[in-house]
Amino acid sequence: METLSARFNALQETLMDLYESGREDLQSQIDHWQTLRQEQILLHYARKNGVMRLGYQPVPPLATSEQKAKDAIGMVLLLQSLQRSAYGQEPWTLAQTSLEAVRSPPAYAFKKGPQNIEVVYDGDPDNVMSYTIWNFIYYQTVNDTWEKVQGHVDYFGAYYFEGTVKTYYINFDKDAARYGRTGVWEVHVNKDIVFAPVTSSSPPTGDGGETSKHTLSRSGSPTTSRLPATTVPTGGSRTSSRRYQRKASSPTTRKKRQRQGEGEGEGEGEETNYRRQRSRSKGRTETERGGERRRRGRSSSADSTTPTDRRRGRGGGRGPTTRSQSRSRSRSHSRSRSRGGTASRVGVSPDEVGTRVRSVGAGHHGRLARLLAEAKDPPLMLLRGDANVLKCYRFRERKKKRGLVKYYSTTWSWVGEDSCDRVGRARMILAFDTYEHRQQFIRTMKLPPTVDWSLGNVDDL
């Protein structure tokens, strides 16, 4: 016990010397992470032998010390690789070589020169998100070499170039679907404002300017067919054709809007597609009309045979009915009941899904009846993150989202089968009355960056 405390105090003194020296060389940062690794190994050994406190320092659980030791080992290997590169002699501080800085986007890369930018969603000055971009990014290649590149920002996000590949590490379109409603945003970089790319809505006439319009699809990509190559990211998911986002017009008009030579073949293809769509819709209309004529023919034939059957009976009564006639009458009777709405409905309507808040009892004798009852299970949302972050988020949301969330759980964690040590991050469950409430909550929620979420449901709350 005394030996462990003495070694632990020695490691603490070494860390204090490193913090007070303020050296900015890479070797000092490697020594810092080596000392942290030894400290976590010592704490792990103490907890494994039943020691709960070293001096005034409580010993953390085994899973915590093990994970921190692995993080320290990974940082040492990463810094040693950077030290062997051409950038090993540059000044490096504790903040630049911290685990949080390395794991921030772009992950597992070193960054210098932070800069804060703001993105305004939906043109609302109150709906503003702040992002941190970097002027210089050091990334590791597959050959264990390091490259230093400059960071950039445009309307779609923050990016850097890996050779000739444009790599985005912040995407504004993902946050626009979470925080916004219209899918339009503005990027404020220092005193400059980056708007949506200008898209042409009509060809230029004469020497006058062309009419332009800011349009944006729900995915965050500009809906344009003519954009400069420098303003469109290289990712295929960020480009979309203009004709899929606007109302269909006549093929002749489309062909006139295309440039001569280049757009002519494209206009012919659109004209062919337009004719195919008209033929398919016309065929469906003919089929529906034919079905109506067949149904009318069956009903008229049934009406015509009724007087004949009555004349065959005695005393004006109904004559003998054949098996085919009884089947047709039962089918027509069921159709009339379904059309009139008097037949009993079997199943669970969309409005009833998620309305049950109690477990299904034993009174359901049959698999179908039980499945229909279980279809009303209440929907849930599971949040994963730091315990304090989840508690603060719950405190804020209980004031803002009144009427959407039925219950908030306390923070909890999983434990292993063989021990009571906590596994992974903390959890918190949100329960809703209906799936519509949960979907509305998802559209308006603003989760912290370190919190993940998933969906599910249970049979009882």
From Swiss-Prot:
Q: PTM details?
A: Phosphorylated.
> Can you say where in the cell this protein is located?
Host nucleus
What GO terms are given for molecular function? DNA binding; DNA-binding transcription factor activity; nucleotide binding
Query: Region DNA-binding domain: start and end of each range?
Result: 377-461
Sorted UniProt keywords:
Activator, DNA replication, DNA-binding, Early protein, Host nucleus, Phosphoprotein, Repressor, Transcription, Transcription regulation
Q: Which SUPFAM superfamilies match?
A: E2 regulatory, transactivation domain, Viral DNA-binding domain
User: What protein name is recorded for this chain?
Assistant: Regulatory protein E2
Q: Which organism is it from?
A: Human papillomavirus 9
The organism's taxonomic lineage, starting at the top: Viruses, Monodnaviria, Shotokuvirae, Cossaviricota, Papovaviricetes
